[in-house]
């Protein structure tokens, strides 16, 4: 049996390099983080052949004297940590003292550094972990590290590297993440002598985000900033008018450190629920700040993952901060508010959208309370007189006798300022905006969004207005949907349905949400049963309620190829200004299309 023995230091460093040095981008990350920890105000990165031939990182930080320069090459030697208490509340980017010796063990490594203002510095050279020349060198205060011929002594590692262009892309992404975290520091990145990134110090987060996300995304950035308990979330998020095919354009930072956290990313995606088409993802730059002792950064070799003491608190802070910003921000792109005379976002400050609670109160005011079904959070009501329209559009119309569609005061807002022209193809509402812009509104998508908003807010208040039936309505469902619905009767009650099994695949429905008057209950309950079958019991069901409510709103909304009176159209337009996320239906489809007068005139040859 082989005897146990202690590995030589060089081999230990190469093993450590297997965790720390995944690719050239890992080296860039570690060296730039060291520069930032040293107080650098300017960092320059140069790479050749994607970093395989050369990685050079130069900074103007505090630098090191000769003794510290040599000590920095020893494993577990660091200036950033002294005891266990410090590890529990680490605030620097690096702290383990592993990266530099690990990098030096798999490359031809040179370190030039100076800690004084006299121009005297130190040069240390290492080849494959073996110390070479240590000599004085003239240089200004700061540090320059050159890493050449990465993995020259570990060919098995080098053969797993991708093409130089691929590795250069990873290096660029690493520098972008670091530049986003520190807008106060200047960054340059050159690849094969070509300037890839130039970010001046103090330009602001919006400029950095524009460089990272692109010019189109920059036009849609919204500021977010809120605190919940000890957690603050701030940064910039793109409105739903701009989305990405993957989640890579969402940059999340915890106490200044870029992290990959699936729960945090999911919280942001949840905040966008119903505003993005399926398969699309939000983009933005978000910072989470919380006390250092409440987050453990020592759980991943490259510190890309963290562990929170209270993960739910961080999830809630992200969700509510982003959702609140989307709810109140004027993200109907370049759409003027009445009385402003300027596009939203260009000054003048459009009126804020009413908060969710106000809308919920309006919904609940439509109905008078009665006996709640046993075991549910819903409230049985009779619809208030005039509360519902003709059975097609479930929102208040009730104009004064003889009043036309333009009569009476209306709420201020984008939709209220539109002049209703008429209905096209019994599907689209045609309107004229101030300035002559043609506005086309999808009647189903817009009504669906309004119904969804009201159902959701009433659901959150646990008081969905419910219409009891004089006689139970018996519906028969497909077997799979019936089984799922029977298992999910409690969830069905929370949605405002009073139903019970009636033998086989049949259910006796004694009441349903008042907003769904006239809906085909068989079709609706079949869809709800199918959705319930796809989720597990417990917390996952809460995540699914958005989709369930969206399905209910879709079934109840006015359809395409259905007549809408001018009064109903006017009431719909006025009502849209009082809800959030009005630019898209709950499934993410656009509600509004605009054609400016200038574009129209160009189309017909007037310009």
Curated annotation (Swiss-Prot):
A GO MF term: mismatched DNA binding
Keywords of this entry: DNA damage, DNA repair
Top-level taxon: Bacteria
InterPro entries noted in UniProt: DNA_mismatch_repair_MutL (IPR020667), DNA_mismatch_S5_2-like (IPR013507), HATPase_C_sf (IPR036890), MutL/Mlh/PMS (IPR002099), MutL/Mlh/Pms-like (IPR038973), MutL_C (IPR014790), MutL_C_dimsub (IPR042120), MutL_C_regsub (IPR042121)
Cellular component aspect of the GO annotation: mismatch repair complex
Pfam families per UniProt: DNA_mis_repair, HATPase_c_3, MutL_C
Cited NCBIfam families: mutl
HAMAP family: DNA_mis_repair
Stated family: Belongs to the DNA mismatch repair MutL/HexB family.
Protein name: DNA mismatch repair protein MutL
Originating gene: mutL
